[in-house]
């Protein structure tokens, strides 16, 4: 029957000091919630249930975008993790597989770790808990074990001195048969210091029924939870450090690794070169051999082999650069395709457009794509030349091997092989400049004498 993924995302996150629900704060270009969903996808879940609470409407809207197949259930009162899991009973009614409990504010659990938990279940453990050896166990719940058996989980505030001396700690992540887990959480008590229903108490309850519980240990860094802006900033730094190291190992040249910023889904091919101060937003693929020069910002775009971007370029969602294209300094590309060998080298905006093979777009060219209500497309054919400071008023098409004269405002289609000229004819007035400047200086002198 597969695995049901339960993501707990109901917490208020008051220490974030924000109107935005904690799980929607961005990390590496994606909300915290997305990271747990991304890791859980490694198990190919048959069902996804997200438990919402604080800011439920916003979290549910985000969930619909991140995982349209997910079911959202609300925890109207935040009475603990066990109570949160209990809210999934209806959504998981009749589900015959395992349930994996993850947390919307714990973004670094790796797919490999979750697969190890699944392997422990397959090896005979009825319940599997993810643990870690903490450098500073202080506030974490402790895992009390006997050999390879997990006996119970004790929250720090309820632990004895001997239990507090343990350094094997609880991450909160758990896997068990879904119906067994739901039965156990339904029987929990809130007789503890916080008057909450702890998911951790299901281990002792399960052992009382003869269930076997085991621990899978992961690096402490994977269990980092986000509760404050400081922790969020630290998590961003940790993610970027890992992403930079991975890129270098994969054969990417980073001119200044410390100033390169990746998103969680950035894909960069071997032998690509990334200059200093480059920022990758979500949804970027850069193929092998491409070059991204300094101070460029990319999101939602595809850069093909041999393409060159920047410096100081911006690629927005929908930008598609074919092989050996050039996008130069202070150029913005949005929802536009550049065919092989096309060049837009200076000071231009290209939006909602298609530029043909080997065409050249001169400095200062603008596609005027927005009429105040609707967006319109511009098409430029192959091997065409767009003169500097051209305005292309969409919808409009420039044919193959066509040209525009410098400063032209194009409002009609240009046939193949034609040149468009649309500007005021220059008129020279002999001697006018000297007369005009003499007049202005006289006015200035008269004004100063007053």
Curated annotation (Swiss-Prot):
Residues covered by region (N-acetyltransferase): 251-450
Annotated catalysed reactions: alpha-D-glucosamine 1-phosphate + acetyl-CoA = N-acetyl-alpha-D-glucosamine 1-phosphate + CoA + H(+); N-acetyl-alpha-D-glucosamine 1-phosphate + UTP + H(+) = UDP-N-acetyl-alpha-D-glucosamine + diphosphate
Active site: 346
Binding site for Mg(2+): 105, 227
Gene3D superfamilies reported in the protein's UniProt record: Hexapeptide repeat proteins, Spore Coat Polysaccharide Biosynthesis Protein SpsA, Chain A
Co-factor requirement: Mg(2+)
Pathway noted in the entry: Nucleotide-sugar biosynthesis; UDP-N-acetyl-alpha-D-glucosamine biosynthesis; N-acetyl-alpha-D-glucosamine 1-phosphate from alpha-D-glucosamine 6-phosphate (route II): step 2/2; Nucleotide-sugar biosynthesis; UDP-N-acetyl-alpha-D-glucosamine biosynthesis; UDP-N-acetyl-alpha-D-glucosamine from N-acetyl-alpha-D-glucosamine 1-phosphate: step 1/1; Bacterial outer membrane biogenesis; LPS lipid A biosynthesis
Region Pyrophosphorylase, residue ranges: 1-229
UniProt KW keywords: Acyltransferase, Cell shape, Cell wall biogenesis/degradation, Cytoplasm, Magnesium, Metal-binding, Multifunctional enzyme, Nucleotidyltransferase, Peptidoglycan synthesis, Repeat, Transferase
Cofactor: how and how many bound: Binds 1 Mg(2+) ion per subunit.
The enzyme's E.C. designation: 2.7.7.23, 2.3.1.157
Domain of life: Bacteria
Residues that hold UDP-N-acetyl-alpha-D-glucosamine according to the record: 8-11, 22, 75, 80-81, 103-105, 141, 155, 170, 227, 316, 334, 349, 360
Segments of this protein annotated with the region Linker: 230-250
Residues reported in the UniProt entry to bind acetyl-CoA: 363, 369-370, 388, 406, 423
Localisation: Cytoplasm
Swiss-Prot/TrEMBL GO biological process terms: cell morphogenesis; cell wall organization; lipid A biosynthetic process; peptidoglycan biosynthetic process; regulation of cell shape; UDP-N-acetylglucosamine biosynthetic process
A GO molecular-function annotation: magnesium ion binding
GO cellular-component term (any): cytoplasm
Top EC group: transferase
Pfam families tied to this protein: Hexapep, Hexapep_2, NTP_transf_3
Its job: Catalyzes the last two sequential reactions in the de novo biosynthetic pathway for UDP-N-acetylglucosamine (UDP-GlcNAc). The C-terminal domain catalyzes the transfer of acetyl group from acetyl coenzyme A to glucosamine-1-phosphate (GlcN-1-P) to produce N-acetylglucosamine-1-phosphate (GlcNAc-1-P), which is converted into UDP-GlcNAc by the transfer of uridine 5-monophosphate (from uridine 5-triphosphate), a reaction catalyzed by the N-terminal domain.
Family per similarity comment: In the N-terminal section; belongs to the N-acetylglucosamine-1-phosphate uridyltransferase family. In the C-terminal section; belongs to the transferase hexapeptide repeat family.
HAMAP family cross-referenced by the UniProt entry: GlmU (MF_01631)
UniProt subunit comment: Homotrimer.
Protein name: Bifunctional protein GlmU
Organism name: Dinoroseobacter shibae (strain DSM 16493 / NCIMB 14021 / DFL 12)
Taxonomic placement: Bacteria, Pseudomonadati, Pseudomonadota, Alphaproteobacteria, Rhodobacterales
